[in-house]
């Protein structure tokens, strides 16, 4: 028994190591917290990723994690997961360190759906093409965007129904267009229409 914690890096390591080829994020930090909460995980640890972090040897990284997370019961990672300077650590080294520091290691096999391995790359590609049904299949949930309402032109007062301008956290978005959506505000879900793109013309 224990508390499940999802550990991630912020910013994405590729943004530090190869800024020009960094992937577009499917979820920002607050969006991640919201999605994890829906599946019962209430703890998200976003570790700062810096050039110094990238130079940390694999063994040192795990030792730092063990010291910071006592008592550490287990670590679950994908079989192809790597860590440490120049990706020198893999699941086999992690298992060795688990024996030394008394924590279990679980290797999670790839998830295959219709013969394809689910991955963030595949999901980003589906979203970029507007194939949100395919994105939802591999996400295990409906594709969603998350953001904060920002000041607009108050067009809702002219149209006779409420509108909201949302500054979204997502970096990977579907093509520009008008979408039928469900909008969540606090605990209420409402049917809505979303315009993704430039400021619409209202006649």
Residue ranges and their predicted role:
Residues 52-162, 186:
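Classical nucleotidyltransferase
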Residues 5-8, 35-40, 68, 140-144, ...:
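A broad, low-specificity signal for short, low-complexity segments enriched in glycine/proline
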Residues 17, 149, 166:
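Short clusters of hydrophobic/aromatic residues that line enzyme substrate/ligand-binding pockets
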Residues 2, 41, 103, 141, ...:
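Short glycine/serine/threonine/alanine-rich loop segments
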Residues 2-70:
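Core alpha/beta nucleotide-donor-binding catalytic domains of modification enzymes
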Residues 49, 110, 168:
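Active-site donor-binding loop signature of nucleotide-sugar glycosyltransferases
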């Amino acid at each position: 028994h224990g508390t499940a914690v999802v550990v991630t890096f912020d910013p994405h390591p590729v943004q530090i190591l190869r800024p020009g080829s960094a992937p577009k994020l499917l979820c920002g930090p607050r969006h991640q917290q919201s999605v994890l909460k829906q599946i019962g995980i209430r703890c998200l640890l976003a570790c700062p990723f810096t050039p110094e972090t990238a130079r940390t040897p694999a063994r040192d990284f795990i030792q730092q994690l063990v010291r910071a997370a006592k008592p550490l019961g287990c670590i679950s990672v994908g079989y192809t997961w790597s860590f440490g300077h120049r990706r020198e650590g893999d699941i086999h080294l992690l298992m060795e360190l688990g024996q030394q520091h008394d924590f279990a290691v679980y290797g999670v096999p790839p998830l295959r759906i219709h013969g394809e391995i689910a991955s963030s790359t595949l999901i980003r590609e589906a979203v970029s093409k507007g194939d949100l049904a395919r994105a939802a299949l591999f996400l295990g949930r409906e594709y969603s965007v998350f953001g904060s309402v920002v000041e607009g032109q108050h067009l809702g007062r002219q149209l006779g129904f409420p509108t909201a301008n949302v500054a979204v956290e997502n970096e990977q978005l579907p093509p520009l267009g008008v979408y039928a959506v469900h909008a969540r505000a606090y605990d209420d879900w409402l049917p809505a229409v979303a315009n993704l793109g430039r400021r619409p013309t209202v006649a």
